[in-house]
UniProtKB/Swiss-Prot annotation:
Its EC number is 7.1.1.-. This is NADH-quinone oxidoreductase subunit C. It is found in: Cell inner membrane. It holds the Pfam family Complex1_30kDa. It is an enzyme of class 7 (translocase). Keywords: Cell inner membrane, Cell membrane, Membrane, NAD, Quinone, Translocase, Transport, Ubiquinone. The lineage of its organism: Bacteria, Pseudomonadati, Thermodesulfobacteriota, Desulfuromonadia, Geobacterales. NDH-1 shuttles electrons from NADH, via FMN and iron-sulfur (Fe-S) centers, to quinones in the respiratory chain. The immediate electron acceptor for the enzyme in this species is believed to be ubiquinone. Couples the redox reaction to proton translocation (for every two electrons transferred, four hydrogen ions are translocated across the cytoplasmic membrane), and thus conserves the redox energy in a proton gradient. PANTHER family: NADH DEHYDROGENASE [UBIQUINONE] IRON-SULFUR PROTEIN 3, MITOCHONDRIAL, NADH DEHYDROGENASE UBIQUINONE IRON-SULFUR PROTEIN 3. GO terms for molecular function: NADH dehydrogenase (ubiquinone) activity; NADH:ubiquinone reductase (non-electrogenic) activity; quinone binding.
Length: 164
């Protein structure tokens, strides 16, 4: 199945233009994922949109791999409507920096999607036009989808019910 990923048109074009940026290419159940260096995310996404016609950013999210380095992975799910092709781009982000450049200048839909990843996971999207909480209140402490966030919430006693 690795052949499917390696023969993917987008992967071939990305390897031609961004060879040093690509860390890994994977295929799982017919879906291709390209893991890239975070430093090149804007140029790479711009190329995907302008040259390869991936004109729809369907989601931006983050995954917390607590205990691993890098701890976070920022995930971009994109789709080419003209080519009827889906692609996933991932960029590792270390816990110490916890930053990546915004892709709002590439896809305007990134605005609220990046705000959600910031609010719930604490990923800072540099140069974002309006990076502030979107779901939690402004005075909320922490980022509730991180794996080290207390299950019972901040400033609350652990649950003493059936699970204790």
């Amino acid at each position: 199945m690795a052949d499917m990923a390696e023969n993917n048109r987008a992967v071939i074009k990305l390897r031609e233009k961004f060879a040093s940026s690509i860390l890994e290419v994977k295929e799982f159940r017919g879906e291709v994922t390209v893991i890239v260096r975070k430093e090149d995310i804007v140029a790479l996404c711009k190329f995907l949109k302008e040259e390869l016609r991936y004109n729809l950013l369907t989601d931006v999210t983050a995954v917390d791999y607590l205990g691993k380095d890098p701890r976070f992975m920022v995930v971009y799910n994109i789709y080419s409507i003209p080519n009827k092709d889906r692609l996933r781009i991932k960029a590792p982000v270390t816990e110490g920096e916890c930053t990546i450049d915004t892709v709002c200048g590439v896809w305007t839909t990134a605005n609220w999607l990046e705000r959600e990843a910031y609010d719930l996971m604490g990923i800072i999207f540099k140069n974002h036009p309006d990076l502030r909480r979107i779901m939690m209140t402004d005075d909320w402490v922490g980022h509730p989808l991180r794996k080290d966030y207390p299950l019972q919430g901040p400033d609350r006693e652990p649950y003493k019910g059936r699970l204790s």
